[in-house]
Amino acid sequence: MKVLMINGSSNNKGCTAQALEIVAGVFKEEGIDSEIIHLGAEAYHDCTGCGLCRTKLNGKCVYDDVVNVLIEKAKSSDGFIFSSPVYYAHPSGRLLSVLDRAFFAGGKYFAHKRGSSVVSARRAGTTASLDVINKYFMINQMP
């Protein structure tokens, strides 16, 4: 079994990354392979709805960045954990931009696979943030 984890924070060594490292340690103890992709401080395009991913690019996004890497790795992954710090009661914009594009272009590679979410916050907003991330799982039939 392989689990792909996405750190939606701009800080590759922050609280969200630390939470994923703890999860990765538990997976290792249980014999489960895992990989963490850190989105980092790079800026990501939002989905423009051009549709080229479905009509001409065979499930790849027109913007050649980490989204296409994520889609490719999703093909061989059995489960996913999407994580984000909480900003104003919401997941990071970078995570949402990446997930919007990955699920639109390569949704079939996520469908019917396990999904979970992790958020980190100093104060409030965790429930709302988890709700936003978990909707990707519900919409894409991920138990």
What annotation goes with each model-predicted range?
Residues 1-105:
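N-terminal beta1-alpha1-beta2 submodule of the flavodoxin-like/Rossmannoid cofactor-binding fold
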Residues 93, 109-143:
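Short, glycine-/small-residue-rich phosphate/pyrophosphate-handling segment
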